[in-house]
């Protein structure tokens, strides 16, 4: 039985109360009065037992060797928190459960999960796709021939002669205004041109030469000469027949 601090004090005077038997005889207490109120002699600081059994831990004084002021001590009575994560309360003889182990630290050689893959582009940049080249975007050259081309003949572009090629062609035109087939092939191989290009250049150069020298067109001159000759041939027989008809008329009159 816990003694009250007031009773320990020598100056405290114990009050005089009648014994419990007088209360029972007088009918003040019921059947359970003596048993129910029998513990009235307990001290004033008496506290009822908690709902859960109190663990038997030795209380350590607040000193240098004990835990600091920040460490939490188990509370008494109703406010006792559960000992484990699953609501398990430690019994007086059961040891305190160990705290959960921390997660393992990542290895220094292994890359972290948050680091992005260097092969993958960042989300903000768009993927570069190859440019699409359509047929109409391709330039058609004269010297390049596509063997797989099955469409119509492409439009020929104008040939740009170099200064060396023009000089050699002018020298050849100065000596010969008309080329033979053999000489045309030789010049084409020498100047890295085709026979058709040599032929067209000489045709244009001859037309320019005739224009510079103001020579008449040979085709027009030949046609005019042929027409005049045909007219003269048709007029001559008629003139020859007229005197013969006149002589024949005079002969008839004389008779």
Swiss-Prot record:
Subcellular localization(s) per the UniProt record: Nucleus
GO biological process terms held by the UniProt record: anterior/posterior pattern specification; embryonic skeletal system morphogenesis; positive regulation of transcription by RNA polymerase II; stem cell differentiation
Biased composition (Basic and acidic residues): 245-255
Residue ranges of the motif Antp-type hexapeptide: 133-138
Main location: nucleus
Annotated spans, Disordered: 31-128, 212-255
Disulfide bridge partners, by residue number: none
Gene Ontology molecular function: any one: DNA-binding transcription factor activity, RNA polymerase II-specific
UniProtKB keywords: Developmental protein, DNA-binding, Homeobox, Nucleus, Transcription, Transcription regulation
DNA-binding region: 154-213
GO cellular component terms, semicolon-separated: cell junction; nucleoplasm
Composition skew (Low complexity), residue ranges: 222-234
Start-end of Pro residues biased regions: 94-109
Family under the similarity heading: Belongs to the Antp homeobox family. Deformed subfamily.
Subunit structure: Forms a DNA-binding heterodimer with transcription factor PBX1.
Function summary: Sequence-specific transcription factor which is part of a developmental regulatory system that provides cells with specific positional identities on the anterior-posterior axis.
Name of the protein in question: Homeobox protein Hox-D4
């Amino acid at each position: 039985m816990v003694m009250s601090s007031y009773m320990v004090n020598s100056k405290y005077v114990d009050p005089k109360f009648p014994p419990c038997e007088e209360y029972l005889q007088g009918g003040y207490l019921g059947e359970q009065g003596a048993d129910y109120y029998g513990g009235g002699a307990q001290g004033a600081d008496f506290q009822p037992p908690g709902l859960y059994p109190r663990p038997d831990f030795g209380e350590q004084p607040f000193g240098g060797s004990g835990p600091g002021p920040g460490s939490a001590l188990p509370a008494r009575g109703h406010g006792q928190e559960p000992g484990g994560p699953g609501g398990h309360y430690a019994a007086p003889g059961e040891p305190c459960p160990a705290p959960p182990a921390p997660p393992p630290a990542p290895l220094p050689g292994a890359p972290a999960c948050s680091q992005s893959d260097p092969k993958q582009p960042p989300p903000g940049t768009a993927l570069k796709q190859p440019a699409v080249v359509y047929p109409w975007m391709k330039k058609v050259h004269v010297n390049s021939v596509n063997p797989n081309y099955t469409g119509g003949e492409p439009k020929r572009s104008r040939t740009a002669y170099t200064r060396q090629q023009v000089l050699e062609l002018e020298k050849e035109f100065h000596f010969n205004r008309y080329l033979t087939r053999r000489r045309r092939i030789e010049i084409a191989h020498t100047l890295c041109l085709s026979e058709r290009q040599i032929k067209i250049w000489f045709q244009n150069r001859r037309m320019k030469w005739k224009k510079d020298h103001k020579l008449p067109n040979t085709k027009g001159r030949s046609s005019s000469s042929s027409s005049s000759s045909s007219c003269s041939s048709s007029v001559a027989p008629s003139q020859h027949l007229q005197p013969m008809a006149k002589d024949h008329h005079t002969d008839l009159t004389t008779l």
